[in-house]
Structures are given as structure tokens and as C-alpha cells.
């Protein structure tokens, strides 16, 4: 009582000191604080603020895509919004609320407590890390408002990010923002590593350390090793822009693909901390210890190690890597699915036989398991170097990425926030603050439905060949885009319940909703889709595309079996073992366990080996046809016709062997823009129409005269990046006549959202006649 009286006396003296004393008190408490709990609270508050801005930007994107034309502005403005949304959600929400809500929010709050430390090792560095990220966020918002804005995409790939295509200082400010964000992450990672290794209490052995602490340690190690590489890549990029260096400029001997090797998307860094939170909540609400703790630690360590070996995963298969390199990345990416599968099965084994209590955090955990599993299965699809040729840079990739992050990391964030809500928000003045359970469940169900309605149709758009990062597209894609737009509104509506739920206890202690939550049915209106643009690939016109479709169906046979098995296990867990007593006693739990017909899965080495063998065998069965197709696609059999494709003007040059085996050269200017019917093809450059002979082996040589392009014709199974300074080649054999459409599907540095490509496949005689004509 004496300490409290002294504290109250100090508060009275400060209040009597006037405005200056009050200002000093608040500055010392919030701005200059070294208290790890206050810093953790400010990290989470900042992440919520950044999440609001990122979510508002994300709502603009589906609204733009709800119609086939640009609603307002041009494609540059659309790309600026896409870039800002991606950078904010990756670096300031997921990274600083999922990862440093392990290295920012949750970790600051609970990691010192879990290892028995009074605070972090370097409290002042902890404060610097927080305010660096705030400054970085301000610079990022500024970059979207300076000049034409930074419309490079969140990966900031050159040459599009070079001064020629993004003049002004918008990209420079964005690069500086990422530099400062990296410094903040690096400082935080070093701080937590030092805290765990130097301040862990003596009696706490490593096997007994919380899985959350393990996830933070592994993530921090990844950050310490990867962020300097990212900083080096950004430094080279900004010197290319301002100091005439040529690290990424082929004119001076550089290579724009080098940047893609350096700027590896840190997906594994982002998702690992969420694993720790999920493990804690599953253990708490199933009334069991986590199954196979050592196996879980080993799985996270393996994911962290393998994450450094798969940097070309799914986004570099088309840049011109040789076939052996692509085969390596295919194998390495499949292998990383094994420890991930071990974690999923171990979580299910923990739930199996447990006394489960369904609460809001547990609902988000179950949602995480379902949605992260879907994202992982589509990740196995994209890991295949042959199959990814058709799916690269389409909305299939967008769907996969968001299922892993928007529904993986973000659901883990919500689960952790609800789980620790009372601990983080209770104090002397307010007492114990609790969220409203019914509002939390409404938040979960609306968001769960919303994100699935938003992102699941994107798989179908990707299979049909719709490219990402465009604001304009053919009308054939409008149906699924419209459904995705409705889903984004449902998700935003669900987030309103979250904000009402977390802020209401500060103003009103009684529950807002007194009636029992009733589930509603959602009716989706059917839309009239053309058969060719529904839920599958476009009709194949080449053996390669037929092989891609066969491989896709083969892979999905196994993945559907896995998904059905996991779904059956989760259904049995929730149906048979759901325990609805609010406050079960130990005796009740023992009676319940003895009453059930199923025995609990005990901790043992045999079952952990089974968990490892199941994904290993399935991936081995998938790898055999995958490698067969990959090497078959690389073969170019005695090409009769060689076609060189040069972007950005899409100029075609032809070489055809005549009867004397001499090469006859032709150019592509056969169909001029003035000769096309009005409205036939939108946003033309010089010429985007070419002809090819059917049943003839063709070699395509693709390069670019300016920025990166992605030249794609879905019916051919072709998607090749046109890179300045590189000659990428691919074989082609068209089996049937017809007119096929493709697209340039990357950010090309020009004011267009969708550049269509028209390819006519005709008989050899007609082909030669049109060339000579």
C-alpha cells in the first residue's frame, strides 16, 4: 500500500504542475519509454493504423476490377495503389504485427516474460526500432504522393523502377522507406536474440522453451541473415537511379534479373511467428500439450533453413533460368512442404482427443488451419517449374499469396490479439477488460466468408489466364472479378465488428449483443459465364499445354486426397470431441476422456515418422511427372521457323527455311493499327498480331528493348519474361488452326492496363503466302 500511495502522490504533484508537467509525463511514458509492454502496445496500435490504410487501399483494387474498364485515372494510378497496398501490408502490417508482433507487438509483450527476463536486452534500441518504423511508414505514404507516384509493384523490380520509367523522387523515397524499415527490423531481431540467449533463466532448458519463443528466435535469425542482402539490393538500385551505376542496366553490363535474386519475397519470415501463436492457442483450448514439441521445433528450423534455398520459387521460372536450375528450385520448394505438413499434422494430433473449447481465438485458429492448408496446396502446384509456366504472373499466384498471408498470418494475428486481449488491455483504472465473445464470432464468420469469396475465385481467373497487376482486362473475366469485389466488401464489413469489439470495453462494460449469435445463409446469384472462361484452363492448342493440364489434374488428385483427409480429421475432432462445458474441472475432463471411443494419440517417434512420410511420398509421386514435363518443355526439336519477339513494341522477326535450306527473313508489320476494326483490340502499341504455321516446330526467341514484359498465350502454355539484355527461348508446336489471344501481363512502364496479343495459327502454305505478301 505504501508504494501505491507514493505513486498516487507523484501523480497529484505532476497534475498540479500544469500543462508542462503533464506533457513531460506523457512524453516519458509513451515517446521515450523503454518499457517493453508499452512498446509492444504501441507496435500493435501502429500496425492496426497501418492495417486500416492498407485495407482501404485494398478495397480500391477490387472496385476497379469490378468492371472491365478503368473507372478513374489511368493504369499508373492503379499501379501506385497496388504498390502502396502491397508494401504497407507486407512491411508494416504482416511484418510488424505478425512477425514483429512477434518482433514488435506480441514479442515485446511476452517474450521477456516467457524466458524469465525483466525486459529486453537493449531497451533503448527497442524504442528506436519502434520510431524508425513510424518514420519509414510516413516516407512510404509520401512516396505515393510525390510526382507520378511509385507504381513499380511492391517488389520494385528494375528496369521499371529506373529513372527512365519513374522519373522524380517517388521511388527514391520508397527505397529510403524500405531501408529504414529494414534497419528497424534488424535492430529488433538482434535485440530479441540477445534477450533469449543471454537473459533466459538458468532453469529453463531449450526443449521447455515456448514454441512462440522458438518461432521468434528462428525468425530473428532469418532477418539478421537476409536483411543486409535486401539492403544491398536496394542500395544498388538507388545508385543506378541517381549515380549512373549499371548494376541492373544491361547497357552497362548489368543484369535486371540480379535484383530478383537479391529481393527474395520473405514469405517464410512472415509466417513463422504466426506458427508460435497458433501452437499456444491450440494447446490452451484443447487442454493438451502440443504433440511432438521437438518435431515442431525441428520443422520450424527446417523451414527457416530451406527458406534460404528457394528464393526463385514460382516467380523466376520464366526469366530464362536453365532447366537444371529450375528443376533444383522445383525440388527444393517441394521439400519445404514436408516440415510444413509436419506442423499441420501435429496441430491436428494435438486437437485429436483433446477437450476442445470453442472460443473466438480458437475459431481463428481453426480458420487458419483450413485456409493455410489451401494456400499450401496451391503452393505445391506453383512449385512445379513446368506447371508454373502457365500460372506465373496470373491471379492464381495472387490467390495463393493471399491464402498464405491474408488468411494465414492475418488470422494468426487476430487469434493472438483476442487470446491476449485481456492481458494487454487490463490495468488499475479500467480493471479487467474483456472483448465481447459474440461480436468476436460475428467478426470471424463474416471475415472467413469474405476472404474466401474474395480470393477463391482468383484461382479460376488464373487458370483462365488473367494477368495480375492490370486495371483493365477483357470482358470475359468480369464475372469472377465481380464476385471477388463483393467478397472484399464482406471482409471490410467484418472488420467493423473487430474495431467495435476492441474499443467498446473502454466505454461500455456490458455486452452489446444479448441474443445468441445466429448463423445466416449467404445466397450468391449465378452469373452467365462463357464456357471457355469458367473454372479451368483455356482449350489447349499445343502438346505442352496438354501436358500442363494433365499435370495439374494429376497433382490435384493427390492434393484433394490430402485436403479431404485433413477436413475429415478436423470434422471428427470438432464433432466428436467438442467439449462445451464453460469451466470443466479436472475430474470432468478425465471422465470425458474415458468415455470417448477414441484413444488419444500419444507422443511417440513412430507417429512423427508417419507425419514425415505422408507428405514425402505424395511429393515424390508429384515430382516424377513434374520433372518429365519440365525437361520436355525445354526441348526444341529441329525448328523450321525461328521467331524473334522484341518488346515493348512487340516487333516480330521471322526466319523460315526454304527448299534450299536457306533462311529467309521477314518482319512483323503485316497488320497495322489503322487496319484493325474499331474496338477490336484496345491499347495497341505498334503491332501485336503475329502468325505461326501449324504442325511445325517453332523456336521463339524473346527479348525486350526496354522494361520487363511477360509474353503469354494461355492456349499455348507459353509465358516467358522478355528481359532487356537477355535472349530467352522456348519451343512451340501448334497442333490446330485458330486465333489465340494472350497478353503482356507485367508492369511495362507504359500507360496501359492490358496489352492483348493476337496469334493466328494457319496452314504452312497460307503462312508462307502471307509472309511473302
Curated annotation (Swiss-Prot):
InterPro entries per record: CcO_II-like_C (IPR002429), CcO_II_C (IPR034210), Copper_CuA (IPR001505), Cupredoxin (IPR008972), Cyt_c_oxase-like_su1_dom (IPR023616), Cyt_c_oxase-like_su1_sf (IPR036927), Cyt_C_Oxase_1 (IPR000883), Cyt_c_oxase_su1_dom (IPR033944)
Covalent link 1'-histidyl-3'-tyrosine (His-Tyr), residues: 264-268
Cellular localisation: Mitochondrion inner membrane
Main location: mitochondrion
A GO cellular component entry from the record: mitochondrial inner membrane
Residues passing through the membrane, by range: 41-61, 87-111, 130-150, 173-193, 211-231, 262-278, 290-310, 335-355, 362-382, 396-416, 444-464, 483-503, 555-575, 604-624
Residue sites binding Cu cation B per the record: 264, 314-315
Region (COX2): 492-773
EC class name: translocase
Ranges for region COX1: 1-491
Enzyme Commission number, as recorded: 7.1.1.9
GO biological process: electron transport coupled proton transport; mitochondrial electron transport, cytochrome c to oxygen
NCBIfam families the record matches: CoxB
Protein family: In the N-terminal section; belongs to the heme-copper respiratory oxidase family. In the C-terminal section; belongs to the cytochrome c oxidase subunit 2 family.
Protein name: Cytochrome c oxidase subunit 1+2
Organism: Dictyostelium citrinum
Gene: cox1/2
